[in-house]
Swiss-Prot record:
Species this chain originates from: Paulownia tomentosa (Princess tree)
Gene expressing this chain: matK
Stored PANTHER family: MATURASE K
One Gene Ontology MF term: RNA binding
Protein name: Maturase K
Annotated Gene Ontology cellular component terms: chloroplast
Lineage of the organism: Eukaryota, Viridiplantae, Streptophyta, Embryophyta, Tracheophyta
Main location: plastid
Alphabetically ordered keywords of this record: Chloroplast, mRNA processing, Plastid, RNA-binding, tRNA processing
Length: 511
């Protein structure tokens, strides 16, 4: 038990940041049977498959070593009878166990200290929540002049992923295992967009692929770690957890030689130093906002492109980074079009017999609904054509009318809920019109009738009941407070659950 505590008590030492070698040792049995550890969030994770237990992984790896079937290559895996007969089962079990183990150092930040100690949560400086983006767009974006719109590229070779994990994982066998999986089933497009995955392996092993993608993105974000001491607005993950300290300092030395071939890092820090900067990211899209000038942002662009090409040994296309001036361009992020406009304000000032008119321009952030991409998504889901004209959608004959209307209404309510942070919500009326008429045409098609005849027989109130937004429901529930609620709904409202409902593709498959 003392040996386990040496691994788990990260508050004492940060030298054991990665626990993957435990999967090849007998400590794994203690992990599985320890009551304190079994009550942790690792064992209670609903996304973990019970069939892929750590004991099964341990026994499987031991069996592979004993039978000497682990020393194989992707070229002869098809001829190997051990691997060929149980290829799908073994790959899923091992990949789940691998992903489970490598998540331990990150999950242990929330686990209480073991055996008799006063329960306390180990504190770590971590990335801010994704929901901190919403107040940033509303409160802070208007204070910046330029933003770098960055699209994080895919790694061009699987060896880049292995090299990234090499500084975390100290066990050579685990790296060979990962390299074998990636060469056997590699499909990076399916890693990024699992819904379009063509590989059955990537569909069954989302946990492993999600970890690999997060580690890849985390390596790209490591470039901003050194700015943490320069700006209190920039939060980054604690470097002791993510990087080997020697490797981290070696990375900083490369920053010096990007522009000037000198050894003094502080003398060249002015190239990228800014008292107030913000960095936010959602999925592959990241933004670096600054109050600096266009020259300053071009320096940052050159710095990012050069460093990423040097560090990852790949060609980083400069067109993946756009320099946008907020006063002239809109920023597309999180399904919104954000822009900064000047709101003129005239103030009359009078001193004795003299009066003056003072013109003040106040910056205001507009978050708009991208109506054209939204209509394109509806057209792709067969709710309308490319011009936005509603069309009937083929449905199963066993679906009832109320079920069909409820599904259309759920899509509209989710879209209305997601875009509640928009400063101008009139664009949603177009979406409501498309879904409402598409629902009517779908029902008319089912009953082999026309839309006019169908609505005349059942009444238009039927659709209004199911295509009712949250605003309408609230007004009907509290009619006396309708005037106050109207003022509230004219403003932006950011709901904390919109991250899980922002994809229209989740609903089109239900028809």
């Amino acid at each position: 038990m003392e040996e386990i505590q040496r691994y788990l008590q990260l508050e004492r030492s940060q030298q054991h940041d990665f626990l993957y070698p435990l999967i090849f040792q007998e400590y794994i049995y203690a992990f599985a049977h320890d009551p304190g550890f079994s009550r942790s969030i690792l064992s209670e994770n609903p996304g973990y498959d019970n069939k892929s237990s750590l004991l099964i992984v341990k026994r499987l790896i031991t069996r592979m070593y004993q039978q000497n079937h682990f020393i194989i290559s992707p070229n002869d895996s098809n001829q190997n009878p051990f691997w060929a007969r149980n290829k799908n089962l073994y790959s899923q079990i091992i990949s789940e166990g691998f992903a489970f183990i490598v998540e331990i150092p990150f999950s242990l930040r929330l686990i209480s200290c073991l055996e008799g100690k006063k329960k306390k949560i180990v504190k770590y400086q971590n990335l801010r929540s994704i929901h901190s983006i919403f107040p940033f767009l509303e409160d802070n974006l208007s204070h910046f002049n330029f933003v770098l719109d960055i699209l994080i590229p895919h790694p061009v070779h699987v060896e880049i992923l292995v090299q990234t994990l090499r500084y975390w994982v100290k066990d050579a066998s685990s790296l060979h295992l990962l390299r074998f999986f990636l060469n056997e089933y590699y499909n990076w497009n399916s890693l990024i967009t699992p819904k379009k995955a063509s590989s059955s392996f990537s569909k069954r092993n989302q946990r492993l692929f999600l970890f690999l993608y997060n580690s890849h993105v985390c390596e790209y974000e490591s470039i901003f770690v050194f700015l943490r001491n320069q700006s209190s607005h920039l939060r980054s993950t604690f470097s002791g957890i993510l990087f080997e300290r020697i490797y981290f300092y070696g990375k900083i030395e490369r920053l010096v030689n990007v522009f000037v071939k000198v050894k003094d890092f502080q003398a060249n820090l002015w190239l990228v130093k800014e008292p107030c900067m913000h960095y936010i990211r959602y999925q592959r899209k990241s933004i670096l906002a600054s109050k600096g000038t266009s020259f300053f942002m071009n320096k940052w662009k050159c710095y990012l492109v050069t460093f990423w090409q040097w560090h990852f040994s790949l060609w980083f296309h400069p067109r993946r980074i756009y320099i946008n001036q907020l006063s002239n361009h809109s920023l597309e992020f999180l399904g919104y079009l954000s822009s900064v406009r000047m709101n003129p304000s005239v103030v009359r000032s009078q001193i004795l017999e003299n009066s003056f008119l003072i013109n003040n321009a106040i910056k205001k952030v507009d978050t708009l609904v991208p109506i054209i991409p939204l209509i394109a998504s509806l057209a792709k889901a067969k709710f309308c054509n490319v011009l936005g004209h509603p069309i009937s959608k083929p449905v199963r004959a066993d679906l009832s009318d109320s079920n069909i209307i409820d599904r259309f209404g759920r899509i509209y309510r989710n879209l209305s809920h997601y875009h509640s942070g928009s400063s101008k919500k009139k664009s949603l009326y177009r979406i409501k019109y498309i879904l409402r008429l598409s629902c009517a045409r779908t029902l008319a098609r089912k009953h082999k009738s026309t839309v006019r005849t169908f609505l005349k027989r059942l009444g238009s109130e039927l659709l209004e009941e199911f295509l009712m937004s949250e605003e309408d429901v609230l007004f009907l529930t509290f009619p006396k407070a309708s005037s106050t609620l109207q003022g509230v709904y004219r403003s932006r409202i950011w709901y904390l659950d919109i991250i899980s409902i922002n994809d229209l593709a989740n609903h089109k498959s239900k028809f």
